[in-house]
Structure formats: structure tokens, C-alpha cells
Amino acid sequence: MSKTYHFIGIKGSGMSALALMLYQMGHKVQGSDVEKYYFTQRGLEQAGITILPFDEKNLDGDMEIIAGNAFRPDNNVEIAYADQNGISYKRYHEFLGSFMRDFVSMGVAGAHGKTSTTGMLSHVLSHITDTSFLIGDGTGRGSANAKYFVFESDEYERHFMPYHPEYSIITNIDFDHPDYFTSLEDVFNAFNDYAKQITKGLFVYGEDAELRKITSDAPIYYYGFEAEGNDFVASDLLRSTTGSTFTVHFRGQNLGQFHIPTFGRHNIMNATAVIGLLYTAGFDLNLVREHLKTFSGVKRRFTEKIVNDTVIIDDFAHHPTEIIATLDAARQKYPSKEIVAVFQPHTFTRTIALLDDFAHALNQADAVYLAQIYGSAREVDHGDVKVEDLANKINKKHQVITVENVSPLLDHDNAVYVFMGAGDIQTYEYSFERLLSNLTSNVQ
């Protein structure tokens, strides 16, 4: 039976994906948000989903209302109106927890790599069988006939606790979100609580010391590069400018050679996790092998374009571990080019907590350009940290730039420009693209 769904904050990455999925399942969908453009809204617009400004008149008691986690009565008129008038709504993660009960559900959790791995698993499985999925890049697919549901499982504020999937991957555990988590131990405890809710199979990166301590009632399968102690092992790596080829063994049994057209050691691990899960769930590895070959990645994860013969990479990396992985991928694909990092720190709390780690990660590039720190809506700038504090710790060529003047980036020949961040780093990227386009109109 068709329902009408209203999304408060429909442009959020998870919210937009869920809206698309429900729309494709035959439901009526609309939503509200701020006017500012977000990359997630293009898919909504292409589907013809109405995006309204926030207004209490948008709400109807007959709708099922899903509210973004950032919105409260003190910062959103629709939430305030709903609370005052007894109109019920569910938060995104609450809705998802009940929704997935009707499917064979497969979650992907982890401090880093969730979106890429969810995208890879969704791509492969949806080419094998009818599958609905939610990816953290704002992509969603829904089918009324789907048996399987793949989703991204987010640890922030323990939002993944309503989820009880049959299968789940945990890519890694790392200290992040210092505005919520107090320590690495706090992060571990959240993941360990989540792991106890998996029912059929948990797949964890075996070379992560924290993940080795995870406990679950479901069978735990470890994956990694090292043969000792891991169940699924990737070996015989061949990393080239066209992607990565590797062999996977399961407890000594050769499962064959696989190829992915993506870059970086982290993506080999992501693929090994996907292979392990689908093998354990009983899927034909020949089909898995075939469809891994065609996985091109997800939005804002090593997204490439060429402007005036200049390679520009856009990536969501906003944690030191992610920066290192992205720069490693860039060197694999472009071994003869200079790697220029253009990075915007995201949140003051994260920048303070990980300042030295950010400097170490960015020093993997050949040159570094920094944008001003992008503060979260959840925090206030108390002046405790400035981007210059990070710049002072970088030992490669570096400079702080503004969106109005990105011309210092032109100082490099034969370079790849890697724009990284979770704020509005894309405005710097677009400014640079306009600068390049003004030099010549040759745009691909």
C-alpha cells in the first residue's frame, strides 16, 4: 500500500538516499530543507521529488514523517510545530531500524570506508539479484520485490543501535567525532554493542587491533592481507594505473583472482570484505567476480574530472586515515605526477583533537594548500584552533588559500589536484575549475 512520506531535511546524504528508495518502491515522497545547493539534491530533482522550504504548513497528520537527526524544536519550525501539536515523527535511524526487518539486511559500519564499501556491495548484489540499498553519498534504490537490503550503518551518536542486520561488515575502528565520542574506548564500546546485534555473520578487518576485541553472538570472519589469523586473505596484489588485481583465499582455499577498477590498498580490503560476505551468504563467486570489475566508485569518493588537461579529484576525506588512503590511491593511478592536496579541515573539535595526525597525513602529498576550517552547525568557534596552526606543522610546500583566489594552485606542472573535505571544499574546486576554464575553453 502506498504511503506519503515527508522528510524534514531531505538533502542530508542518508535522508536523500532513503527518499529516493521509498519513491522507487512506489510511495509518494516530498521533503523540506534549506535553499543552499547540496550535491545530494540532483538525484531528488531528477526523480521529480518536491523539495520545499521549511514551513509548518508542510506537515499533515496523514503523512509518515522522517526527521533528520540535526533538527530540533529550537532550530526547525517543522519539528517545533510537530511537537506542539502532537504530530508523530521518526528519526532517520529509528525508521531504518524498523524498515529493514522485512529484508535480508546487510550493513556496512566502520570509522572509514563505509560509503565506498556499501556502494561496492550494493553494486555487486543488485546485479545478481533484486536489491534495495542506501548509500551515504545520497544514492538510494528501492524495489517493491527486493529480498535483500544493503545499507550504511553510522556510528555517530550511536545511530546504528536500532539496526539488527543479518550480516555486517566493520571496516575499522578509529577515534573520530570528538564532539560526541570521548575516547577510542568509547568508540570501541559503541561498535561492540552494535556487533552484538548481528545475527548471521560479522566480517571485520583482522589487522585492526580494536576490531580483534569485538565480540558477537554471530560468527565472526576476519579479513586482511596477512594469512595468519585471518579467514579471508587478499594476496598476490598487482596495483596498476587501471586498478587492482588480487587473489582471495578462505581458510586456505583459493577462491580465485579478482579485479577492481578502483585504487588504493583500502579498496582491496573493501572488496575482500564484500567477497567474504557474499561467499558466506551463498552467492556465486563467478558473478561476484564479474560485477566487481564494473564498480566505478561512489559520489565524492575519488571522483575525477579533467579541466584544461588538468586532473582534479574530489574526495570526502576529512580524517587523517582517509587522507592517507586517498593520497595512496592518487599515487597508484598517477605515479608520474605531482600530488597536490587541497584540504579543508572539518569541525574545530576534530582539528584540535587530530592536529598532528592531519599534518602527518597531508605530508604524504608533494604540496599542500589549506582552506579555512569548516565549522559544524553543532559547534561554536571559540578561537582555540586556526588553519594556520595546521599549516605550521606541514613540512612540504604549503599555503593557506581563499575561495576568491585559488591562483597559487597554478604554480604546478604535471600535477594531480586532490580536493578533500566534508564541508564546502567543492566551492574551492569549482573556483579552480573556472580559473582553468578561463585559460582555455577545453573542458571534458
Swiss-Prot record:
InterPro entries: Mur-like_cat_sf, Mur_ligase_C, Mur_ligase_C_dom_sf, Mur_ligase_cen, Mur_ligase_N, MurCDEF_pg_biosynth, UDP-N-AcMur_Ala_ligase_MurC. GO terms for cellular component: cytoplasm. It holds the Pfam family Mur_ligase_M. It catalyses: UDP-N-acetyl-alpha-D-muramate + L-alanine + ATP = UDP-N-acetyl-alpha-D-muramoyl-L-alanine + ADP + phosphate + H(+). This is UDP-N-acetylmuramate--L-alanine ligase. ATP binds at G110, A111, H112, G113, K114, T115, S116. Belongs to the MurCDEF family. Keywords: ATP-binding, Cell cycle, Cell division, Cell shape, Cell wall biogenesis/degradation, Cytoplasm, Ligase, Nucleotide-binding, Peptidoglycan synthesis. It is found in: Cytoplasm. Pathway: Cell wall biogenesis; peptidoglycan biosynthesis. It is an enzyme of class 6 (ligase). HAMAP family: MurC. SUPFAM superfamilies: MurCD N-terminal domain (SSF51984), MurD-like peptide ligases, catalytic domain (SSF53623), MurD-like peptide ligases, peptide-binding domain (SSF53244). PANTHER family: UDP-N-ACETYLMURAMATE--L-ALANINE LIGASE, UDP-N-ACETYLMURAMATE--L-ALANINE LIGASE-RELATED.
